[in-house]
Structures are given as structure tokens and as C-alpha cells.
């Protein structure tokens, strides 16, 4: 059993810490880059996605000028233990709409309805929701009421309706994270540890991987419409 809590203000630090750990542990699953751990650049993307979610959690304070809500699932037996979370970005000028940039459930708590319950909680307030996911996750989101709308780079764009919202949704500047000093330091460390050739190979592998994902998504979406 589990409990759901909706947060519209900053969470206690222990909750944030568990959410960020879940994000880092599930990079391949929830990132649009979906790099495997075998790629040498994995640590860079781990840091970047963790920092991105950290910024969204900070934005619950209202100080970043974007609307953010958070649904947290905790173990009913141990309320301090986070087993899932869903980040929701309400849309300005459209009270029924939201975007869902991140959602994850602890590996040991999957297939117990946690993800579905968090999604139902959000859809009860924002029935017009949009998200992007991997091809493999499409059936799970279809079961929650989403439909395929198209391709967004390396992911399938899904919506609970056949059209997107006309309202504005505040998002963070992710590109700035990759230009940050911290990311440069991680890259320098990896370069010193593995050498330039290995890092160039890792970048080529990443680029091929992203091209393959984009082709896979495009083929899937074309097939769906066919």
C-alpha cells in the first residue's frame, strides 16, 4: 500500500534527496537521451538530469517564475520512504492543461498501480495533459488515457486529447546546465581518466544512439498513423 501527497511548496530535504536519487538511478528510463550506463558520458547526463529535477523542486517556492506541482508516493508502512514521484507543470491561461516532464517509480514498487494512481491524481485536476516517452512506454501511457500525437526528437509525444494546449507552459533552460562549470569539471575528470580517444568514441556512440532513437520514434509514429 502507498499514500499520495501533492506539493505546491518546497518539500522537506529528505523527500527531495530520495527523489533525486531515483532520478539518477533511472536515467536511462526517464531521460530523452536514454544513454546506457556503459557510455562514458553517462555521468554527465546523470548529473545534468539530477540538477534539472533539483531546479524544478526549487521552483516549488515560486521564485523561478514557473508553475510547478509535485505528487509524491510514499510507502504506507513507512511514510518517510518515497516510492514514486510525478512532476507537473500547469499551463498558464489553460486551467485544464499541464505538462509532465518527469515521473518515476522505485523498481521494487512497480506494477502495483503507483504510477497510475499518481497520474490519476494529476488528471483529476488537469485532464488535458501532455508528456513525451520512449516507444516502449507508449502502451503503459495509453492505458492511462494518453494517445500518440507525434514525435519529439527521441521520444513519442502523447496527450490525453487529440490536440495540444494553446496556453503557455514554463520550462527551465536545460542547455544552461550543460554549459555549467560542474558539467565542465565532470567532463575534464572523465577526459583525464579515460583519454581523448575514448571520450570522442563515447560522443560518437551517443550521437549514433540518439539518431537511432529518433529514427525508431519516427518509424513508430508513422506506423501508428498508417
What is each residue range found by the language model?
Residues 30-97, 102-103:
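A conserved beta-strand-loop-helix scaffold within acyl/acetyltransferase catalytic domains
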Residues 125-129:
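Short active-site oxyanion
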Residues 105, 110-124:
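Conserved acetyl-CoA-binding loop-helix of GNAT-fold acetyltransferases
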Residues 1-33, 132-226:
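Terminal substrate-recognition subdomain of acyl/acetyltransferases
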Residues 103, 108, 134-136:
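Beta-hairpin (beta-strand-turn-beta-strand) motif
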Residues 11, 15, 45-52, 110, ...:
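Soluble or luminal CAZymes and related metallo-dependent hydrolases
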Residues 99, 130-133:
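A structural signal for short, well-ordered beta-strand segments and their strand-loop junctions
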Residues 76-77, 108, 161-164:
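Short loop segments at secondary-structure junctions
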Amino acid at each position: 500500500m502507498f499514500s499520495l501527497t501533492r506539493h505546491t511548496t518546497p518539500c522537506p530535504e529528505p523527500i527531495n534527496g530520495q527523489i533525486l536519487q531515483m532520478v539518477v538511478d533511472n536515467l536511462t528510463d526517464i531521460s530523452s537521451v536514454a544513454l546506457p550506463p556503459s557510455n562514458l558520458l553517462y555521468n554527465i547526463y546523470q548529473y545534468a538530469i539530477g540538477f534539472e529535477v533539483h531546479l524544478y523542486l526549487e521552483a516549488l517556492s515560486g521564485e523561478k517564475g514557473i508553475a510547478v506541482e509535485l505528487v509524491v508516493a510514499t510507502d504506507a508502512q513507512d511514510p518517510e520512504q518515497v516510492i514514486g514521484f510525478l512532476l507537473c507543470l500547469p499551463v498558464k491561461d489553460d486551467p485544464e492543461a499541464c505538462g509532465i516532464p518527469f515521473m518515476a517509480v522505485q523498481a521494487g514498487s512497480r506494477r502495483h498501480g503507483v504510477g497510475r494512481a499518481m497520474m490519476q491524481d494529476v488528471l483529476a485536476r488537469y485532464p488535458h495533459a501532455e508528456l513525451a516517452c520512449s516507444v516502449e512506454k507508449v502502451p503503459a501511457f495509453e492505458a492511462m488515457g494518453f494517445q500518440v500525437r507525434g514525435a519529439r526528437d527521441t521520444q513519442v509525444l502523447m496527450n490525453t486529447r487529440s490536440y495540444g494546449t494553446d496556453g503557455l507552459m514554463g520550462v527551465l533552460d536545460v542547455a544552461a546546465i550543460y554549459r555549467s562549470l560542474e558539467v565542465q569539471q565532470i567532463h575534464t575528470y572523465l577526459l583525464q581518466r579515460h583519454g581523448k580517444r575514448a571520450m570522442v568514441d563515447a560522443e560518437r556512440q551517443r550521437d549514433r544512439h540518439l539518431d537511432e532513437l529518433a529514427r525508431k520514434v519516427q518509424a513508430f509514429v508513422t506506423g501508428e498513423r498508417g
